[in-house]
């Protein structure tokens, strides 16, 4: 079967997948999966030392088979080793903290008919690999190899698709915490920018702030669009919570920062 690759760059600067060094270094002995279960709150995502950006597999929502779900209990990490339902990569997530924060801007690669419900587009996975600054996983439902790496202020994702139609989704309505409020604007055929509200560290509703991002694609997509879904609510008289997002075909790239959008694009 002929394979095709798309490169997704979540970047303030270009990110590079490094070649393996011939001599072993201390970094080669690191196991990023340490602390990813038994409430260790760590994650195996790609991040550099003191880096602002991290790219983390998100597997804590969408499946009744998950051992842990972010909305079923106090939960502070986008990843748990024993969960096996992947709904995308989260960006800017924290590792090793005891309260939920960040872990949003979820990007997901799919194939076949388009669906924007994470319960439907989520998938089981296998062949996880992680090393300092790198993570990869194979998505069973789609036959897609997903890879991620990071620089201090950027990240890059590379997807190897089977032949056929592929999609990359940017879900702004879901994340580790459930703040409502997001905006996305098309800048050109290959670039969008937007804002997402984050915060409520330790479920403190007053601690909310915006994060700004720019998303660029390496190829002009054949089609693109937006979706908005209402989150199900229980025990409230009325509440409006938009589930914003954008879908595009083929390849995308994003910038992430706590600066304004035009400053993000400059980075």
What are these model-predicted stretches?
Residues 19-23:
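Sec/Tat signal peptide C-region and signal peptidase I cleavage site
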């Amino acid at each position: 079967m002929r394979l095709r690759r798309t490169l997704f760059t979540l970047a303030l600067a270009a990110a590079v997948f490094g070649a393996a060094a011939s001599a072993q270094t201390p970094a080669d002995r690191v196991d990023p999966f340490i602390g990813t279960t038994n409430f260790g709150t760590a994650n195996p995502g790609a991040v550099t030392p003191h880096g602002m950006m991290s790219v983390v597999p998100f597997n804590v929502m969408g499946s009744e088979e998950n051992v842990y779900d972010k909305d079923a209990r106090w939960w502070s990490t986008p990843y748990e080793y024993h969960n096996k339902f992947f709904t995308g990569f989260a960006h800017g997530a924290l590792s090793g903290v005891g309260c939920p924060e960040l872990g949003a801007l979820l990007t997901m690669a799919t194939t076949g008919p388009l669906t924007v419900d994470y319960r439907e587009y989520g998938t089981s996975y296998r062949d996880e690999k992680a090393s300092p600054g790198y993570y990869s996983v194979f998505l069973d439902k789609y036959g897609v190899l997903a890879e991620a790496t990071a620089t201090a202020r950027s990240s890059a994702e590379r997807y190897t698709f089977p032949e056929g139609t592929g999609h990359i989704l940017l879900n702004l309505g879901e994340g580790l915490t459930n703040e409502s409020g997001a905006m996305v604007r098309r800048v050109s055929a290959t670039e969008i920018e937007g804002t997402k509200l984050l915060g409520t560290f330790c479920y403190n509703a007053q601690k909310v702030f915006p994060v700004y991002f720019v998303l660029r694609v390496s190829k002009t997509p054949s089609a693109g669009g937006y979706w908005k879904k209402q989150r199900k609510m229980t025990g409230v008289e009325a509440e409006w919570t938009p589930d914003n997002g954008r879908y595009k075909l083929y390849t995308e790239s994003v910038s992430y920062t706590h600066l304004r959008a035009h400053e993000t694009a400059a980075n």
